């Protein structure tokens, strides 16, 4: 199965909570699960186009960390995404990726572009590949939406004060989404067959945007976890998305 490197960004685009100044709202603890879900759905309404820059660090057990800078442009109207990763010191392009029309196009200045069906695309870590996630799991988050798994009929819910947990399970995997005050705070994923585990935790709120200030992703398979940390550096929620900005070659 194909894997992509340095792509932990795919697990994080939670939305902002919405409050109307003229309306006195009940404390979140007093809302029903249905009311909380409706507030979450409304809070995650995606922008037509946005652009963000971020720094990413990867840590493997017993090895020194690796760093890269990244940018992402998301066209929600046409379901297109463009990533670029560069060296943090010299600014040299390391890799680039476009997602559109059901395919992932990934390449680098040294390698030809690979075309991979989205259903077969795996968000991976570095050398030991302990971070392994199906891209579909986080696709809606990357487009600025909550995964439909959160609202599915077979999803189970539980609450702890201001926190809401949505647990979805099928034959292959189990996913747990944690929300607090209408914002996603963590996603936990377990693949049953190969015991691949991953957990993404989002902290803080980047000003005037739906992004967290930091996302930490840990992945492990029967051993110490591999870690990736993403720190957001700039966000433009009114960016322009044009055809030329989503090349496939």
Residue ranges and their predicted role:
Residues 143-210:
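Extended beta-strand-rich segments in extracellular/periplasmic secretory proteins, especially
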Residues 69-74, 175-177, 200-204, 230-232:
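Hydrophobic/aromatic beta-strand elements that line small-molecule binding cavities or substrate pockets
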């Amino acid at each position: 199965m194909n894997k992509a490197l340095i792509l932990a960004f795919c697990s994080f685009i939670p939305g902002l909570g919405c409050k109307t100044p003229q309306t006195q709202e009940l404390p979140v603890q007093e809302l029903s699960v249905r009311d909380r879900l409706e507030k979450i759905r409304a809070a995650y309404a995606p922008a037509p186009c946005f652009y963000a820059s971020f720094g990413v660090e990867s840590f493997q057990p017993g090895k020194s960390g690796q760093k890269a800078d990244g940018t992402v442009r998301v066209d929600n109207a046409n379901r297109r995404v463009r990533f670029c990763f560069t060296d943090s010191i010299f600014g040299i392009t390391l890799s680039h990726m476009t997602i559109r029309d059901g395919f992932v196009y990934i390449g680098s200045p040294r390698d030809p572009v690979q075309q991979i069906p989205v259903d077969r695309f795996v968000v991976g870590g570095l050398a030991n590949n302990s971070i392994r996630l199906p891209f579909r799991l986080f696709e809606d988050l990357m487009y600025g939406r909550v995964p439909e798994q959160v609202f599915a009929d077979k999803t189970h819910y539980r609450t702890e004060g201001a926190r809401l947990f949505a647990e979805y399970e099928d034959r292959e995997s189990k996913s747990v989404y944690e929300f607090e005050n209408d914002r996603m705070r963590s996603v936990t994923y377990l693949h049953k067959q190969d015991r691949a585990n991953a957990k993404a935790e989002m902290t803080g709120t980047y000003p005037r945007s739906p992004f967290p200030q930091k996302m930490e992703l840990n992945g492990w398979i029967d051993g110490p976890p591999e870690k990736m940390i993403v720190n957001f550096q700039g966000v433009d929620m009114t960016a322009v998305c044009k055809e030329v900005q989503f090349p496939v070659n």
